[in-house]
Amino acid sequence: MSDQQLDCALDLMRRLPPQQIEKNLSDLIDLVPSLCEDLLSSVDQPLKIARDKVVGKDYLLCDYNRDGDSYRSPWSNKYDPPLEDGAMPSARLRKLEVEANNAFDQYRDLYFEGGVSSVYLWDLDHGFAGVILIKKAGDGSKKIKGCWDSIHVVEVQEKSSGRTAHYKLTSTVMLWLQTNKTGSGTMNLGGSLTRQMEKDETVSDSSPHIANIGRLVEDMENKIRSTLNEIYFGKTKDIVNGLRSIDAIPDNQKYKQLQRELSQVLTQRQIYIQPDN
């Protein structure tokens, strides 16, 4: 029964607005407390922003940079609140983490023109793993509010030769938009999308891990953007057009009347015009 309840709960969460995930998740846990751990580990939540007091830069919070009640900043590598024995990446991986944060900071500025990004890496037995987080929220200046949250979890398995690596990327994007205009009123549109991909890439000085991961994330985000634009927003536009006619109703009625008259004329011509013997 618990497996069926979990499947139903996850299916319900996929259909609810992303901007209300925390409230809906809390309500579900109150209804079925036994699903608490499974739901918290399975449902991606909107990213929260914190401020690194050491360097004065924002960073994003998630389970991957949390240890107890403290979160590690990718900029200063310090936990807030301070934690003496918190989990830390190895020296080699920390150097890679710093480079990745600088690279994706530029990527975020180029593609999103604002927002906050963070990259966290951790060691594995035969390689390493990491998460790339990007958050961009609209300020509502054009009567449009919204938020984009993308979570890219990548696992890197380094081959024994050291010249190639296997990359496994799992990406989740949560997007919601809200418009409030005099002509159309208030409209909410949102959803989440998760995609996976795996690929082997050459690792060299000209194509290091950061470049390979960057290309994978860039390709994945472009595909997800295209899917959201063509399927979700495109389908919504079709539904709205089906509910509300763009043309004025009187003009539409005149067009249908003209169709009927033309049909009658053509029918009469078929009856009275006989072929020559």
Swiss-Prot record:
The organism's place on the tree of life at top rank: Eukaryota
Record's GO cellular component terms: brush border; cortical cytoskeleton; cytosol; F-actin capping protein complex; hippocampal mossy fiber to CA3 synapse; lamellipodium; membrane; postsynaptic density
Signal sequence bounds: none
Protein's job: F-actin-capping proteins bind in a Ca(2+)-independent manner to the fast growing ends of actin filaments (barbed end) thereby blocking the exchange of subunits at these ends. Unlike other capping proteins (such as gelsolin and severin), these proteins do not sever actin filaments. May play a role in the regulation of cell morphology and cytoskeletal organization.
Protein's UniProt keywords contain Acetylation: yes
Organism encoding this protein: Gallus gallus (Chicken)
Residue(s) carrying N-acetylserine: 2
Taxonomic lineage of the native organism: Eukaryota, Metazoa, Chordata, Craniata, Vertebrata
Assembly: Component of the F-actin capping complex, composed of a heterodimer of an alpha and a beta subunit. Component of the WASH complex.
Single Gene Ontology BP annotation: actin polymerization or depolymerization
Similarity comment: family membership: Belongs to the F-actin-capping protein beta subunit family.
A GO molecular function held by the record: actin filament binding
Protein's UniProt keywords contain Cytoplasm: yes
Keywords in alphabetical order: Acetylation, Actin capping, Actin-binding, Cytoplasm, Cytoskeleton
Listed name of the protein: F-actin-capping protein subunit beta isoforms 1 and 2
Tissues where the protein occurs: Isoform 1 is detected in pectoral muscle, cardiac muscle and gizzard. Isoform 2 is detected in brain and liver (at protein level). Isoform 2 is the predominant isoform of nonmuscle tissues and isoform 1 is the predominant isoform of muscle tissues.
